[in-house]
């Protein structure tokens, strides 16, 4: 298969084909089995995080260094010319991208990554999260983790639990899995945090089955993947938050009727939505999922910056 990802901007999941997603997943698995320390030799990657990040930033920078590349950039916009001197984002991108072979960016503004791609003068832009919009590289590591644990991306039953309204990770992953066959979704959330209508409408147009549920209990026996998310406290008053939060806490006891192959995933950080007793069950896979971020991002960088591997 030709590498259609070479020199491509990675802005959103809908712009990636099933074949491209499969190529990234396959490459991540190959790199995990057999490290490739020279794929980014003599390459410079700009890592520009305009808002706080721990896992994504460190995962990207680890991926770059393990492939033999060099990193330039910053982890806070506070000390940049944008903040100190009023430079526009477009000007900043144009200058920094000229120093690098690829430009990795996280920004609080929706659409910032798309804007960056228009001013990077051909340097590939990789979206590391733009507001509540898209987080494509989280989706890539999620897909790789699902494939690693289930051996397939077709014919899966997957539930998303918690904040499905604002959680960009669940939007992107739903759109990605919708490219595969026989996937059934369970969306488990309070009405105020339900999956956005546009996602459900996309699934309706594709004829993909999904259910809207209020509790995990009835779905767990059917699932291959249980994807937990954090309910964000700042969006509720204290009493409402306490009520909603308590309805979506997963314990080891809840997993007793689960299939043997069920894996529990979470984009992290978790707060109270997964009890620590789940950590010791064979279903817990969220820490391995976070580790897989390095391999998925290595695969993406390698494919974007090498015409062939």
UniProtKB/Swiss-Prot annotation:
SUPFAM superfamilies: Aspartate/ornithine carbamoyltransferase. NCBIfam families: asp_carb_tr, PRK00856.1. L-aspartate binds at residues 85, 168, 230. Catalyzes the condensation of carbamoyl phosphate and aspartate to form carbamoyl aspartate and inorganic phosphate, the committed step in the de novo pyrimidine nucleotide biosynthesis pathway. It is an enzyme of class 2 (transferase). It catalyses: carbamoyl phosphate + L-aspartate = N-carbamoyl-L-aspartate + phosphate + H(+). It comes from the Bacteria. Keywords: Pyrimidine biosynthesis, Transferase. Heterododecamer (2C3:3R2) of six catalytic PyrB chains organized as two trimers (C3), and six regulatory PyrI chains organized as three dimers (R2). GO terms for biological process: 'de novo' pyrimidine nucleobase biosynthetic process; 'de novo' UMP biosynthetic process; amino acid metabolic process. Pathway: Pyrimidine metabolism; UMP biosynthesis via de novo pathway; (S)-dihydroorotate from bicarbonate: step 2/3. It comes from Aliivibrio salmonicida (strain LFI1238) (Vibrio salmonicida (strain LFI1238)). This is Aspartate carbamoyltransferase catalytic subunit.
């Amino acid at each position: 298969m030709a590498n259609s990802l070479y020199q491509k901007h990675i802005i959103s999941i809908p712009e990636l084909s099933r074949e491209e997603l499969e190529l990234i997943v396959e490459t991540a698995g190959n790199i995990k089995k057999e490290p490739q320390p020279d794929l980014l030799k003599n390459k410079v990657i700009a890592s520009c995080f305009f808002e706080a990040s721990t896992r994504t930033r460190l995962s990207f920078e680890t991926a770059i260094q393990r492939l033999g590349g060099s990193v330039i950039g910053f982890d806070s916009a506070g000390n940049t010319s944008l903040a100190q001197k009023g430079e526009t984002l477009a000007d900043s991108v144009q200058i920094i991208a000229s120093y690098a072979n690829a430009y990795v960016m996280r920004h609080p503004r929706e659409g910032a990554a798309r804007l960056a791609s228009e001013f990077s003068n051909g340097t590939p832009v990789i979206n590391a999260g733009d507001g509540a919009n898209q987080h494509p590289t989280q989706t890539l590591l999620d897909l790789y983790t699902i494939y690693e644990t289930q051996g397939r991306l077709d014919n899966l039953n997957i539930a998303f639990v918690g904040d499905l309204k604002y959680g960009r990770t669940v939007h992107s992953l739903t759109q990605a899995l919708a490219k595969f066959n026989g996937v059934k979704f369970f969306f488990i959330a309070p009405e105020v945090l339900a999956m956005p209508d546009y996602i459900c409408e996309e699934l309706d147009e594709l004829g993909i089955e999904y259910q809207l549920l209020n509790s995990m209990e009835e779905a767990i026996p059917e699932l291959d993947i249980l994807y937990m998310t954090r309910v964000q406290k700042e969006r509720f008053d204290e009493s409402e938050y306490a009520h909603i939060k308590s309805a979506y806490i997963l314990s080891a006891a809840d997993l007793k009727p689960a299939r043997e192959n069920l894996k529990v995933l979470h984009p992290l950080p978790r707060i109270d939505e997964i009890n620590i007793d789940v950590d010791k069950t064979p279903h817990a896979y969220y820490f391995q999922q976070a580790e897989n971020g390095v391999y998925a991002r290595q695969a993406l960088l390698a494919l974007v910056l090498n015409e062939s591997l």
